Amino acid sequence: TNIPPHNLREVIGAVVKIIDNRINEDRDTTLEEILEIVKGPDFPTGGTIIGKTAIEEAYRTGRAKIRVRAVTNIEPMANGKNRIVVTELPYMVNKARLIEKIAELVRDKRIDGITDLRDESDREGMRIAIELRRDVNPNIILNQLYKHTQLQDTFGVIMLALVDNQPKVLNLYEMLKYYLMHQEDVVTRRTKYDLNKAEERAHILEGLIIALDNIDRVISIIRGSENVQTARESLMKEFNLTEAQSQAIVDMRLRALTGLERSKIEAELAELQKKIDEYKAILADKNKLLTVIKT
């Protein structure tokens, strides 16, 4: 797979569009709607994409060859000469190798008219200066550089992904759709995990409340038991507790057990119950699940 980098805001905007259409209109999103949001690749090194046809082809079919040119300017010099200044390179083009290639073309006389070649890059940005003879047309030299060097390069787009463990070339909408399906799976698993943990904790708190309501008897049972197992079994039998609840009680030191504040436990339990209700609502309603992903 070879997918060019994109502007994150545009990609997120497209995913949000898919979610909104499902929630508000109960329909799929068209590729045309996606193309209104995602304008094209966003190469971090800059460069200029030549033509829009290849971009649309990539988004519609999952395959295309996108031509990218360096950003250049022709600057007149004080001595009457011109120079070509390169300030942005096509994606993945190595600056040092590019300069070597230009020098090689000049040395082999495949390009005639370049008198000096300098890397003037600094912390302000990338800059390559190509000085020319007075008698040459800078546009002709520039076109020769596009032809023979990576000042013009091709990015081959292949939007390949595993779908049901099978490689498949996807268009842009399909790629975003499967990404959203993955997010649905991730959020569902996470919510089930959070629900399970919240229910486990609530279950323990319910046992602690029972223990507090019968604190003297609980302490008597623990002190009168030969070992932890006997204490746990006695608590389970007398107060109809589960093994997890009774284990949580016997695991606490008596000082900690007697120091528990019922109001704090009840407050935590009430908060947990809200979360439990929220988790269950998310798992029961696809639109709520999509809203969680969106936010």
How would you describe each model-predicted region?
Residues N2-T295:
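C-terminal interaction appendages of subunits in large macromolecular complexes
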